[in-house]
Every structure is written in C-alpha cells, then in structure tokens.
C-alpha cells in the first residue's frame, strides 16, 4: 500500500507534468513552423520598403554577394540598376549606430535613414532626424574627410558631434561600398 501511495503522490504528478510540457513544446514548435515563413516574408517586405525609401528609383533589390567595405553590414543592388542600398554601422555616443544609405548609379546619396541606435533621446538624436539627414546628405557624392568636422559639405549638430559623425561615417562607408562595386564591374 505504501508503494502505491508513493506512486500516486510522486510519480503520477511528475508524469502528468512531463506530458503537459511535451504537448506545449509540440504546440510551440508547430506554431513556430507555421509562423516562421510569414515572419520572414514580413521582415523582407519591411526591409525592402526601407530600401525603397533611401533609393526611390530602385525597383526591387537583390543581396550583393561580393566583398563588403569596412563597416558595411549588407548591401543590396537595385534590380533595375539604379543604385545600391547599404546598411552600415559605426560607433556612436550611446553604442553602435546603424544607418541605411541609398546611393544612385551616379554615386550620389539619395537618402539616409537611421535604423538603429542607442543614443540618448534629445540632442544626440537630432543628427538622425529626416530633415537633417536629407539636407546634409542627399546629393552628396564624396565623404573623404576623416570626420564630419573636417568636411565642409556636411554640418554637424552642435553638441551632438559624436552622433553626427557616426551618421557621416555610415554614409562614408556606403560611398566606399559603391566605389568597390564600381571598381569590380559596376552595378550591372
């Protein structure tokens, strides 16, 4: 009798818990299997929309499989040969800043958007506002200076020089990526 009580009080609850865990794990795995392709497609559409925002003339994008410039995380070629959309990173005040930069087939910046940063809201993030980015970088075809303070063509945000420089360096990396592609046969 004592053995039967031990089984009912200790083993049965443990077995029930194991069965519940197996059922929940199977349900979670099934849900992940069903949702994973949908999530991947949504992420691709979101990324393509961001690429289209920085390179409006681009019509569809294909991942560039060649060599990437330093600081470039990924590069996509516009399917119609109108340019590239580059995601680049650089150290900023609060951590790593990530920006997406569009460069047209003439080597000019068509758009910049900051896609990730850890800078303090307020002054530092002014260097990431759409008006600042468009006014300073659209049409830029060269960013050869060592930092933003040495480039007369681009204005830094006073008090946010580190954040401004991080954006500048991301644009510089994107333009370097364009030059790499042009040096290896061009966009087509």
What residue ranges belong to the model's regions?
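Flexible, solvent-exposed loop/hinge segments and secondary-structure transition points
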Residues: 2-188
